[in-house]
Regions:
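Ligand-site clamp/hinge motif
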Residues: 185, 215-260, 378, 387-389
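Structural transition elements
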Residues: 314, 318-351, 367-372
Length: 451
């Protein structure tokens, strides 16, 4: 993937906070379980999904439960970012990068016995690009599909309006999973896919349980018969659940101050690594006075990222200067773009004609990084004359309000890789609307290597 034009990268830096938290996972030591030969696992999750259909709702927690487990797409994104076949066994691309011909796997069934074929693929993508679609990738991916043809039951041809060098990658995201026409409408609560697991039970507020599907094409290599995702938002409750043996692992562990306790306990394995997640303080670009770029820059200069990282993550995070993670291809370090400079922040506010104190609302979802981090941010903003009233909301409230533009500032972790192209969508929740950026983004997509 080629690097984005420099002007593109600069415009991606216009938010108050941008950092990468270390990905921490705590697992029960496999050696300690060797004698039990467990065929089930209980995994802790920070947030409960609001739906189980990733094609209609934006929450990343949905994909964490269903993607590659229940629902699958044409391609698979591997941990190293490479793309390999999944429901498509192969594909070809024409010379101008606009037409993709996918050959589909034969003999694949949905969990209700329905056949997986080209008609299901066509239905899924037409549904994603429909006028009333709420698929979060509609603007970035599916609206760019000009035509879908199905020469036979195992061939799909997708013709794009404009070349997209990341198209095969996008086909591996959870927004592009394939649903059957007969079961798609119920996918929010009863998803039926082609993956190795099927939904057993969703005890709302507590857990989602999946069981092995014996009809899966590679069922012999699926070792776990049951997987339960248990929802534990509170950091201290995560610690207690691990110590009590109530869960077998906790991805994105929310109590960094407790890591040493687990690192010295031979019952556990602690994994620390990189992540594609970007923790940001999102600014509503459509609301005054945030529609003035000088105000947005002032917010950026008001934030001491090091103090935030130390206070929330015990130092286990890295500052970034744009909506690109170091794990993204083409990453450029822009951490110096908006350095911590309270006096410059005050000057920019004055230049923009903003009277201080400026009263704003800081809407915070449940994760500890947002709640604890929000308090730190509010204290920092106060020092430049911005009074942030904290509003703590539940996850469903956050999604319902924020994605309708009902917020001033918020704190959230964007976990999808290469999602900086969301800034080319003026209807996305942060309301960033720049024709210059959209033109650059289109040029970037058209010139990026597609293989």
């Amino acid at each position: 993937m080629t690097q984005a034009p420099r002007s593109t990268r600069r415009q991606l830096g216009q938010f108050g906070l941008a950092l990468i938290a270390a990905a921490s996972m705590i697992l029960v030591n496999p050696a300690a379980q060797a004698q039990s030969k467990k065929d089930s696992a209980v995994i802790g999750m920070i947030l409960e999904p609001t739906s189980l259909d990733p094609t209609t709702a934006p929450a990343a927690a949905i994909g964490e439960v269903v993607h590659y487990n229940i629902l699958e797409g044409l391609t698979k994104i591997n941990p190293d970012g490479s793309v390999t076949p999944l429901l498509a066994e192969s594909w070809t691309m024409d010379a101008d990068g606009k037409a993709f011909t996918f050959k589909l796997r034969k003999g694949v069934k949905f969990q209700d016995g329905s056949a997986f074929d080209s008609a299901a693929v066509k239905f899924s993508f037409e549904r994603a690009k429909a006028e009333k679609s709420t698929n979060k990738a509609k603007g970035a991916v599916f609206s760019n599909i000009a035509h879908i043809s199905t020469p036979d039951a195992h061939t799909v041809v997708l013709v794009l309006t404009n070349p997209d060098g990341n198209f095969l990658f996008r086909m591996g995201e959870n927004t592009a999973v394939i649903l059957h026409p007969n079961s798609a409408d119920a996918a929010a609560t009863k998803p039926i896919g082609t993956g190795p697991y099927k939904l057993d039970n969703w005890a709302k507020g507590t857990a989602v349980t999946l069981t092995k599907w014996d009809g899966y094409r590679d069922a012999a290599n699926v070792k776990l018969k049951k997987v339960t995702f248990r929802f534990i938002n509170d950091a201290s409750a995560q610690v207690a659940a691990l110590l009590a043996g109530d869960i077998d692992g906790m991805p994105r562990f929310q109590s960094p101050q407790s890591l040493k306790q687990f690192q010295t306990d031979k019952r556990f394995v602690v994994e620390l690594g990189s992540t594609a997640g970007k923790g940001i303080m999102t600014i509503n670009n459509k609301k005054k006075p945030f529609d003035d770029v000088r105000v947005r820059r002032a917010l950026s200069h008001a934030i001491d990222k090091k103090a935030f990282i130390d206070g929330v993550f015990e130092g286990l995070a890295k500052p970034i200067g744009s909506h690109m993670a170091p794990t993204d291809a083409g990453y450029v370090d822009l951490t110096g773009q908006y350095a911590f400079d309270p006096e410059k922040a005050k000057a920019l506010l004055k230049e923009a004609g903003v009277q201080t104190p400026l009263n704003v609302t800081l809407t915070l979802p449940p994760p500890p990084y947002a709640r604890k981090g929000g308090e730190i941010l509010a204290a920092q903003l106060a020092k430049v004359g911005i009074v942030a009233k904290i509003e703590n909301v539940e996850w469903a409230q956050w999604l319902g309000g924020t994605f309708k533009g009902n917020f001033d500032l918020t704190v959230i972790n964007h976990v999808e890789p290469l999602d900086y192209m969301a800034y080319a969508n003026p209807n996305y929740y942060w309301g960033y609307d720049s024709k210059a950026f959209r033109d650059l983004a289109a040029k970037h997509s058209a010139t990026t290597g597609a293989k």
